[in-house]
Amino acid sequence: MHRARAILQAAFYDYPVDDLYSLIFGEEEDIGTEFIKGMGLAVSVRDEDTNMASCELDVSRLGLINGDIFGNCFDKVGEFAHDMFEAVGSLKIQQNHLLKWREITRLIGEELLTTAYVAKYNIRTGLCWQDVREVDCPWLDRALKDGVCDIHSHLNASYDAYLINWIGLMNQIAGKAYFFDRLEHPKDNPVVLRDYHFADLYSWCILAAKIRCCLYEYFVKGGKSEAWFMEQMEVFSELRHLTYYNGLVEDVENSLIEQREKSKSIYQRDDILDYAIEMNMTPALLDSPYAVLSGERRIMYSFLMAYYHGHFRHSKIIQLAYLYERIKTEFRKELVQTNRKTGLVNFKLYNSSKDSFSKQEKGLKDVMRAYGTQTSLYKPNCFLEGRFCIRDAEDFMKLQYDKGILSKKTLNQYNGRVKYVIHLTRKNILNTNRLEIGRRNAWKDEINAFLFMHDQCKSFTGIDFAGSELYTRPETAAGTIRYARNHGINQITYHVGEDYYDLLDGLRAIDECIRFCEMDENCRLGHAMAMGVNANNFYRQNDSEIVLPRQYYLDNLVWMIKKSQEEGLHLDVELEKWALAEAERVYGEIGYVGHFNMDQYYASMLMRGDDIFDRPGDGPVQRQLWAYLTNNRIIENGNMPITMKVRKDYIKQVVRIQKAICRLVADKSICVESNLTSNVLISNVMRYDAHPIVSFRKIKGRTQKELKVTLGTDDKGVFATSLHNEYALLVTSMMKKKRKQGYEAWYDQHVADFIKHLAENSMNYRFQEWQ
């Protein structure tokens, strides 16, 4: 790990808040030495290639600059930011440093680093810069100049849930214990350095709200003494011994009420989102959606200006400012995906947390939605296709995203650049009855609601099936999609091939989606990672063992054989014998009646997407299908896990089928929606340049049709990204791979042409308005 990044991660991400609090408020005389020891341990735990002694030696240099080790953490922030930015005065990241920047900001965010850079070098800019830094790459800007659309964006996860929720908390902290209780278990376990003291996240946020209030009074408003600051903080000296915080919350909330009332009086407005926002900024800045963040930035900017330029050196207040930033990062861990655990189950922990503080506060929810929409349209050449559930449709229709969040002024630049897609959610539990009558009826009701919305607003252009694909196969959606098509809805996108037990299972899901849902050139596939994931790497990462439900195992084996036959693929004789024997064995274990007949079983698989109530007959295929759909014993046995030992010839066959599925998608002119950061964090792809989007571009179908691919953000708030950032990360990773491998990788012009092609696809394959 890069040394500077390791220190920043240890200081602002790993160092336990409890231990930090004990140092600052405790009776330890030499807190610098204790802090250095803790930092050394934190660095060595994350960086396994470095021994403890060298870590402590490197960290000890923090205390050699001016003797204030906590202040020197802020010096490290400023130095690192200086190295990352393109030039003094620019807020663009150097392209060759983008991946370094991304690795640390994924953990601690961009706000502190950018604010430190602006303050340290006294850059004359407003406090309304974009929340995700752009990269200095002129030809990328040229490639996107003719228009680019984010066609895979879930609007309820597109806002900065961390910062906006944080600002809401820092302005009203009382009565929020319930919201913290609703958070899932900690997403990234802390490195425990000392004895752990009881103090939950809510209590730390109460402390942070008080520190923030004091920083604002001292550095922004002025006129307060250092003695006043410390007197205000005295009440927290025994925080770790408290079990109930009623008195503490009341004291802090009174301070916040006082600040809000002062702001209301000064600006003659009742709708003050943050007492720290300067509402008298220039109209252009006040119109910006990023003005919402300007109050938080203003406080830290004022502190860092005083610190960096030698106007302030009070060590205890510096320590409290550092503690404030560390608590912010601890809160951020709950809302932005920072851990490296893969799979949708992990992602859903973050996705469910993002609304924990805003569900009951409509004003804050409206701010978030407007922010997410406007920040997706930050440039005139940007377009958006936003997705949300039907229950949120009315709120989004009423949302005045064309008005400034703070200025309330109509901003015509957003008009006509937003279209809406309604997503129908799949359930997240294993089936007990595969007929799913209740879900099918619910989806039909949602289609009817969509048609009603479409009659009122033509910006509703299509439907999307989202949620866990592990538990709801494409067969369940087939009838709903037929119903939608019969009512004029032909623009459909389907999340598929993103989350799977076995790579072959993901490929089967894509094939079933195309077959059962009759996907064509008007449709798109969301993610479809299984089509391009490196099969050898996938099975190596899983130690050549796959755990999956018996029913999936049986279906995969049968489908592998029959799909290979249909596509004319080579199938090793020994592999086919093994697959048939395994299928027959598992068929019996699940409890199906009668002798295993692969042709009959596969015929029943092909009928799963049909409306079985309209299909006559009572033959063996129909009975096989009915047992699969309704027999509780078979369903229960089929859901039981089984472990598959992966053979080498099996992997080779998976690769052949991957290519066949890619040809199928290309032949049908179905567009694939790729989402770089989302897929890297959720799937088994660990590097940007290993993302399937890079291999998709090489695919040529049997009719020489090229596979159509786009790039989107998915959930840009949860992943702390932007559409421009997604393109920049892809460009940078591809170019770095070129430099590493020389002539065998991509030339700059190849990369430029590819990026332009992605942008053009995003405009050509976005859903259009229809009558």
Where in the sequence are the language-model features?
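Metal-cofactor-binding active-site regions of metalloenzymes
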Residues: M1-Q771
